[in-house]
């Protein structure tokens, strides 16, 4: 049976890879990509894959109501990705934008989707960034302790989903890395290290290189997002 599938933030790092995976089945479903940017090469490719593209913002309630209201599946990937990594990098304007897009945008979607719609939301491992003890195996029921605006907004999003009564899946992702033919996040550690090494540069490690970093390949994240669209997948769940 044809399903109506929405991908918000579909021109982004994860969204681009997810669209590629959907390209093999896009003639069997009604797939719409929503993004507030217009990147002509990616938009043309999406349309060639028989997907619709809508340039718009999830803060626009009328747009959300028009295109998302009767969705069967929503991959909610939209959000601000240019975020501060330390308190010194933070600014009030940037923090407010992260909060507005993340929290108001998510609520706009939750307000219009049906209880039968499955919403798949990528959260982040940095919701644990305030934990002082170094842990290598954090369980899903561990209390979150966000510090910066990005992780704080994601923690709020998780609570929005849990209280919504909707059919949701939360994926607490590690730092997503890897090459995509359409996009490349050079600000991500493994990608940056690969670039430096390919140019015979020097990698500088501080604190003796003892830091622990959670990493997950881009393609695995996209596959996971697709996997959880299955009717057999767990519902109302958080997965680390």
Q: What residues fall within each predicted segment?
A:
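NAD(P)-dependent short-chain dehydrogenase/reductase
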Residues: 159-213, 218-222
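Conserved Rossmann-fold NAD(P)-dependent oxidoreductase catalytic core, especially the SDR/UDP-sugar
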Residues: 107-147
């Amino acid at each position: 049976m044809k399903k109506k599938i929405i991908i918000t933030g579909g021109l982004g790092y994860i969204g681009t890879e997810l669209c590629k995976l959907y390209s093999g089945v896009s003639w069997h479903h009604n797939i719409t990509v929503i993004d507030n940017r217009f990147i002509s090469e990616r938009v043309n490719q999406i349309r060639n894959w028989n997907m619709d593209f809508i340039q718009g913002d999830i803060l626009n309630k009328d747009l959300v109501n028009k295109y998302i209201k009767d969705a069967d599946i929503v991959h909610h990937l939209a959000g601000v990705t240019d975020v501060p990594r330390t308190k010194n990098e933070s600014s009030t304007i940037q923090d407010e934008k992260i909060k507005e897009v993340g929290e108001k945008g998510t609520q706009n979607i939750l307000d219009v989707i049906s209880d039968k719609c499955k919403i798949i939301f990528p959260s982040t491992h940095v919701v644990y960034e305030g934990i002082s003890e170094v842990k290598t195996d954090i369980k899903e029921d561990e209390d979150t302790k966000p510090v910066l605006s990005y992780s704080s907004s994601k923690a709020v999003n998780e609570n929005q989903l849990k209280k919504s009564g909707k059919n949701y899946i939360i994926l607490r992702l590690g730092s997503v890395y890897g090459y995509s033919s359409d996009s490349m996040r050079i600000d991500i550690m493994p990608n940056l290290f690969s670039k430096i090494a390919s140019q015979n540069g020097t990698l500088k490690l501080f604190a003796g290189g003892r830091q622990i970093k959670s990493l997950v390949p881009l393609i695995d994240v996209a596959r996971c997002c697709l996997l959880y669209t299955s009717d057999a997948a767990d519902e109302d769940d958080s997965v680390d």
